[in-house]
């Protein structure tokens, strides 16, 4: 019910942008207090295809979730670091900037379309957010309730913030935890899982996260609490995995999905899919075949947008 109301309000904003924002904020604040979703769109991909066009196509199916700004981050295995491209305004601005993704090379990445909650609509506040030297790059849907406390603690450690967002606090906190695990004899995956585990314990609020680590090309991480997130298991032709805030984003590429549960973490590569609980214990999750087409998925399986 909440999801359908939320989509209806997003539709109203698209049709009547001058008059719907106040209604939207009333409803979205209620949803946040009661564990519902905050509207932003997340897409991620790792596989054998070029990631940027896939990310942008997926985001076009999630644009009802936000059109204040959009961005993508893509890693080319031959490049020294992750490339981040962001644009203020509707997704078409980002598509023009990147030649519909063709100008950004690499087979692993994350994308985001934003409806502003903390920080004004701007390129600086757009996702993805990144740490120094892009050691950690992160997209987020939700609200980090204790972001100010985290921000102040990180500033005392010498971290410098570029944006006004709660998401950057989560990104730099994850970077801090990841850095602390260096030299401890852990594998890169173990370090990442430990850092994400600590983040999930420290952060209060709702979140769905898509994460890239600069020293792990081709690996895509995801985690969630009280904000929706799925894994798409791509066809042999695409040979890889996706993440998304909602089913429509992946239906152009696969009908097979895994629903990430609350307090769960996903680690994805082109060939492997691992799901963990918050204690970093690997768990089995069923693959669900979506029977709807893309148009029906946008209505969550219902016949109409309105009841």
Language-model segments: which ranges?
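Basic polycationic patches enriched in arginine
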Residues: 4-7, 21-22, 33
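Conserved short alpha-helical segments that host acidic/polar catalytic motifs at enzyme active sites
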Residues: 29-304
